[in-house]
Amino acid sequence: MFRRVAIDLGRSDPAIAALPTEERVARFGEGKDPQLAALYHQFGRYLLIASSLPGTQPANLQGIWNDLLSPPWESKYTININTEMNYWPSEANALHECVEPLERMLFELAEQGAHRAKAMYAEPRWVAHHNTDLWRQTAPIDGAEWGMWPMGGAWLLQQLWDRWDYGRDPAYLRKVYPLLKGAAEFFAATLVEDPTTK
C-alpha cells in the first residue's frame, strides 16, 4: 500500500539533506528542501496507513500513538474538522482501503444518530454533533458554543462522496447512498428560513 505513490519535488542541497530530520524541519523556512517536503508527504501517508486499516478504528486525534489514560481532548473523534482532515489525502494518495474504518463508523453513527435526531429534534433520519467516540456518541458534548453543531455526520460524509468520485463504482454508491440521503433529509426537515434575511 505504501509503495503505490512516489513523489519527486526535486533535489535538496546535499549538505541540507545530510542534516538530521529535526534540524531540517527547523531550517525549512530558510531555504529550499524539496526532499523534506516529499518526506513529510510520505510521513502523512504512513500515519494514515498505520492508524486506519480495514477492520480497525478510524484515525482519531492522537491515533494509535496515545499512551495516556486522560489524553488531550480525550482522544475522541472531533468531527467538525479534525477527523475529516485525517482522511482528506486518502483518495489522491491511493489509500482508499484506509477509508473503510471511517465508512463503518458512519454506518454506526447513523444508527445512533437516528435515536438522537428523534429525541432532540423530533425529526427523521440521523444527526451527529461535534464529537463522537468509540461508542459512537452523537449528542452534543462539552461546550455548548461548539457542541451544539449538528453537521458532524453530514460533513464526514464528504469523504464517502470523494471515495465514490474517485472510483465511480455504482455498487459503492448504492451502499453509502442511504447515509447521504438520511443526512440530507435530516437537514431538509430541520432547516428554517431566517425571517430577518428575506
Put a short name on every predicted segment:
Residues P72-E193:
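Aromatic-rich carbohydrate-recognition surfaces in CAZymes
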Residues D33-L36, D169, K198:
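Loop/turn elements at helix/coil->beta-strand transitions in domains of secreted/extracellular proteins
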Residues M1-Y77, L95-R116:
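Acidic/polar, glycine-enriched structural segments that form the non-catalytic walls/loops
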Residues G55-I64, K175, V192-K198:
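Short, glycine/acidic-rich hinge or "gate" loops at secondary-structure transitions
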